[in-house]
A protein has these predicted regions:
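Nucleotide-sugar-dependent
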Residues: 164-175, 188-198
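Extended catalytic core of nucleotide-activated donor transferases of GT-like folds
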Residues: 1-59
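Short alpha-helical segment that forms part of, or immediately flanks, the ligand-binding pocket
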Residues: 153, 176-181, 195-196
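Acidic donor-binding loop of glycosyltransferase active sites
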Residues: 11-14, 154-171, 184-185
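Conserved catalytic-core segment of nucleotide-activated headgroup transferases in glycan assembly
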Residues: 64, 70-138, 142-149
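Short acidic alpha-helix that forms the nucleotide-activated donor recognition element
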Residues: 4-8, 148-160, 181
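A short, active-site helix/loop in glycosyltransferases that binds the activated sugar's phosphate group
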Residues: 42-68, 74-78, 133
Length: 230
């Protein structure tokens, strides 16, 4: 009712709603509502004037391409600077980074593997933005989340690659797209359910790890190199 009231008061032709995709009260009965679905849903949940998925992967896997898709626009600040000096990270150190929801780095064996590497290799740093702290080590750095786009770009500029450790995976994967757009390789767990974040990437853009041993091998053999062209 509130949506109808404000929509008519503002003389709107359309209302855009970004949500999980399920049927709920966030739809107008009087004004054409455009639904941008972010998560997997059954076809019976489709509603609104127009209903689109957030990624090609989501449309293909959960609607058999019956629904169109509209991905996010990935746009980052143009700054070339980074956070290494402020964080006392040396130029020759390899930096693996990740940013996302605070509980999104939740695969326990990945956490333990990173800690094991940090204890043995002084030339490797793990850098997290907005991720809940899961261990204490001087070369595993946790930064508070931010809405500052310049700071976020500086964070990505500080990293040589992204280490992805979310057990569910992504129906889009904005953080992964931001890293990839800057030529950063993605290391992602092989046995996750949702794989939109690597769906359209070529093999040079990502590698999947399947176990602790496999992840150790991939990270220990990673070499600093020029970023690939996306």
């Amino acid at each position: 009712k509130d949506m109808d009231h404000f929509g008519q008061k503002l003389n709107l032709d359309y209302i855009y709603v970004q949500k999980g995709g399920e049927r709920d009260h966030n739809v107008s009965n009087r004004i054409k509502t455009l639904i941008h679905s972010l998560y997997p849903q059954n076809l019976k949940e489709i509603h609104g004037h127009k209903y689109v998925c957030v990624s090609e992967w989501l449309s293909k896997k959960f609607t058999n391409n019956k629904m169109p898709f509209l991905p996010y626009i990935v746009k980052l600040n143009k700054t070339k600077t980074n956070l290494k000096k402020n964080l006392q990270i040396k130029k020759n150190q390899i930096v693996f980074g990740c940013h996302g929801g605070e509980n999104s780095f939740d695969i326990e064996f990945v956490r333990q593997t990173l800690l094991e590497i940090a204890k043995k290799r002084k030339d490797v740093v793990f850098l997290f933005l907005n991720i809940k702290k899961f261990c204490k080590h001087p070369r595993i750095i946790f930064l508070k989340g931010t809405f500052n786009e310049i700071y976020k770009k500086k964070f990505i500029n500080s990293c040589d690659a992204m280490i992805y450790g979310r057990s569910l995976g992504e129906s889009f994967g904005l953080a992964c797209a931001e890293f990839t757009s800057q030529g950063k390789k993605i290391f992602s767990y092989k046995f996750i359910k949702h794989k939109s974040h690597i769906y359209n990437l070529s093999k040079k853009n990502f590698e999947e790890y399947s176990s602790r041993k496999n992840l150790l091998n991939l990270l220990n053999n990673f070499k600093k190199e020029k970023s690939f062209n996306f």
